[in-house]
């Protein structure tokens, strides 16, 4: 069985779109776990109604389970961890309540994962204007590659449930939670983020699915939406957490990649006209390549992460 864990907070206006996509999911057995995070609108009632619908619907091709949990601790990560604690599936994946789930995603990913710990893939984002973009992804990404390209996003993988529990679940971050989570997912390293983390550090077995899945909706109040300067304080907190709490487990190359990524984000803030906010985002190092990346992005240059990745792979500009 695969458990699909979905945090929900005040999403009554997007839930029917989500439910419509979940009704088309072909894989069985599947367990949908909605974790209400203190909604003040009708979200929890709508989730419970959908769960009742699933219970009443006969399933000709295997078990279909759905449950609504309540998580009093605020934050999507707390809700995901509550769902992870509850999950009964051998495998699990995570999703957001304002997006659309691909019907054959679980069937295809379950085939691809084989005996691996994690199966990665790519997802599709959709803007409010209707523009579509395929997120970065390729087989067997390195930690430093994820730091620059963000190969792991919330919806871009399935994994063994015991493995996700062992690496500590989700860290309590206000933004870019999947950026930090992806480091541990790819490496098998963990911090004692939660009680019960018992995994010895090891490299996980990774599988790859070549498909492009889901419709991830970007908007101002989504987890992934908004401008850089509006999220500057939260992004800065996420970077500091990664630098001091997570990257201490990795080699110097990972720290260099993080510095490049911070420089790129600083450039985006400058491009948006917010130079003071960019200065507040500490690089932690003075480096010519970082400065060049920042200036390039501030001038609205594109593909800076690819340039930075080339520097990393050539191993010419580290230190």
Describe the function of each predicted region.
Residues 63-65, 73, 105-163, 167, ...:
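Flexible acidic/His/Gly-enriched loops in nucleotide-sugar-dependent glycosyltransferase catalytic domains
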Residues 92:
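Short aromatic/hydrophobic "clamp" motif used to bind/position activated sugar donors
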Residues 266-319:
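Membrane-interface aromatic/basic loop that binds lipid-linked glycans or pyrophosphate carriers
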Residues 210-220, 225-253, 275-286:
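Catalytic core of nucleotide-sugar-dependent glycosyltransferases
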């Amino acid at each position: 069985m695969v458990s699909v864990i979905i945090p929900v907070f005040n999403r009554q206006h997007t839930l029917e779109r989500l439910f419509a996509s979940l009704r088309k999911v072909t894989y069985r057995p599947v367990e949908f776990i909605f974790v209400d995070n203190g909604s003040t609108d009708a979200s929890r009632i709508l989730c419970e109604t959908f769960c009742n619908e699933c219970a009443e619907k006969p399933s000709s091709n295997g078990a279909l389970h759905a449950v609504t949990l309540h998580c009093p601790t605020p934050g999507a990560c707390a809700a995901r961890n509550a769902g992870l604690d509850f999950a009964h599936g051998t495998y699990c994946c995570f999703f957001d309540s304002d997006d659309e789930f691909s019907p054959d995603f679980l069937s295809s990913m379950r085939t691809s994962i084989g005996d691996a710990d994690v199966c990665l893939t790519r997802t599709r984002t959709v803007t409010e204007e209707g523009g579509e973009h395929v997120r970065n992804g390729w087989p067997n990404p390195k930690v430093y590659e994820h730091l620059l390209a963000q190969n792991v996003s919330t919806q871009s993988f399935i994994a063994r449930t015991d493995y996700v529990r062992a690496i500590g679940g989700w860290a309590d971050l206000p933004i870019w939670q999947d950026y930090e989570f992806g480091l541990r997912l790819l490496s098998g390293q963990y911090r004692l983020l939660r009680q019960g983390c018992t995994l010895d550090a090891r490299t996980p077995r990774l599988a790859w699915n070549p498909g492009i899945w889901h419709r991830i909706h970007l908007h101002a109040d989504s987890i992934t939406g908004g401008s850089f300067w509006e999220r500057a304080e939260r992004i800065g907190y996420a970077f500091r957490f990664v630098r001091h709490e997570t990257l201490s487990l990795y080699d110097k190359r990972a720290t260099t990649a993080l510095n490049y990524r911070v420089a790129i984000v600083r450039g985006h803030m400058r491009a948006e006209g917010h130079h003071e906010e960019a200065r507040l985002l500490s690089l932690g190092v003075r480096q010519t390549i970082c400065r060049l990346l920042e200036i390039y992005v501030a001038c609205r240059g594109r593909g800076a992460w690819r340039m930075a990745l080339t520097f990393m792979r050539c191993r010419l500009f580290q230190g």
